[in-house]
Amino acid sequence: MMKTLSPTVITLPWRPDAAEHYFAPVNHLPWAMLLHSGDAIHPYNRFDILVADPVTTLTTRAQETTVCTARTTTVTLDDPLHVLQTQLEALPFHPQPDPDLPFQGGALGLFGYDLGRRFEILPDTAARDIALPDMAIGLYDWALIVDHQKQVVSLISYHDADARYRWLTSQRAPTRTPFRLTSAWQSNMTRCEYGEKFRQVQAWLHSGDCYQVNLSQRFQASYEGDEWQAFERLNRANRAPFSAFLRLHDGAILSLSPERFIQLENGHIQTRPIKGTLPRLNDPQADRQQAQKLANSMKDRAENLMIVDLMRNDIGRVAVPGSVKVPELFVVEPFPAVHHLVSTITARLPDSLHATDLLRAAFPGGSITGAPKVRAMEIIDELEPQRRNAWCGSIGYLSFCGKMDTSITIRTVTATQGQLYCSAGGGIVADSNEEAEYQETFDKVNRILHPLEN
């Protein structure tokens, strides 16, 4: 089959809220997805990406991946990322990379935390009480790209771009009940239970069984109404550069993530793990001192360095030998609710490997598991009452042009069957303080739980 070199691009009138303007009428459609830069004051705030109406969908639940097109539905037990690579390569689109068009059609969606069970042997202790898929990916032959840096709105399509624009502007969202919580947030563990789990982790750490474990608690509330309204509210409150709204058949994912997982561009790999958190303070001088306190914290630096080493090892499994570098170590980045300690790891991917090979080697991200990764994941499955599902997985895209960019789905709400789920955790190391770690879980989600209560 002839390869199509590039999509047709039409430029639409600029408006800074173009992503919300065009997404609102389609947000109710299954497989409508929005990657939003959150209007963040952040280096990675340039693009918003909107898709809907995919040509193919891939849905993984446990061992089965279901591939649906307009004509066929097939079920396979193959490695889900291999299935994804095969489906991408089967489509006749192979554009050249364009720095102004990061996503030129391709795969976009959710890689849930529990997809990691396909790549590592893990226990089956935690309850699977959320019915959403482990992987939910659409393949799209069009997209809307909002470039906030150049103030350009581009609609790209491999077919009739004008017809796609007419389709997009003809959509009308149904009238929805306004969003509201119908119960208070409830944790899946008491303060006493958290303490017991914390001390179990400490025992494993002091015995040398592991070096760091990310222990979380999950908050749940019932709700009614429009999840898109909830996302708009959260987006204004959090302004996170890797935000996303995914509409699935049986629910929605509302992500306000500050963290990049892996980017691949022209063979260059970048990952930016977050490890180390302190809450923002209202007084500017006290807030600057808080940032300096985080920068100087030996505990947080040690915690961060463990994950840097883990990510170097994960990426090194597939990178060109000798190419793994750490250009940034222990950088403090401010966000609306918290200061984070961030490091950057870079490498090169051999031409012989695909973005899915890189994703498989590093999934799930080390910043939300611990070290060593597999042992930490075993402990997480034993101590956390329920599976993580979408939380601590990844949301992102693999473009037909070869570029990949993905987030870590922290600060993320799962909405399904009238219930909201939102988790928060922290990396526990040998000298962690129980009360400080417990409080950190609240510091991380206050900007999510409270806006939804109002």
UniProtKB/Swiss-Prot annotation:
It is an enzyme of class 2 (transferase). InterPro entries: ADC_synth_comp_1 (IPR005802), ADC_synthase (IPR005801), Anth_synth_I-like (IPR019999), Anth_synth_I_N (IPR006805), Chorismate_C (IPR015890). The active site is at E259 (proton donor), K275 (n6-(4-deoxychorismate)-lysine intermediate). Gene3D superfamilies: Anthranilate synthase (3.60.120.10). It comes from the Bacteria. It catalyses: chorismate + L-glutamine = 4-amino-4-deoxychorismate + L-glutamate. L-tryptophan binds at S37, Y44, N45, R46, F47, P241, F242, S243. Its EC number is 2.6.1.85. Its cofactor is Mg(2+). GO terms for biological process: folic acid biosynthetic process; L-tryptophan biosynthetic process; tetrahydrofolate biosynthetic process. The keyword Magnesium applies. GO terms for molecular function: 4-amino-4-deoxychorismate synthase activity; magnesium ion binding. Monomer. Heterodimer consisting of two non-identical subunits: a glutamine amidotransferase subunit (PabA) and a aminodeoxychorismate synthase subunit (PabB). Belongs to the anthranilate synthase component I family. This is Aminodeoxychorismate synthase component 1. It comes from Salmonella typhimurium (strain LT2 / SGSC1412 / ATCC 700720).
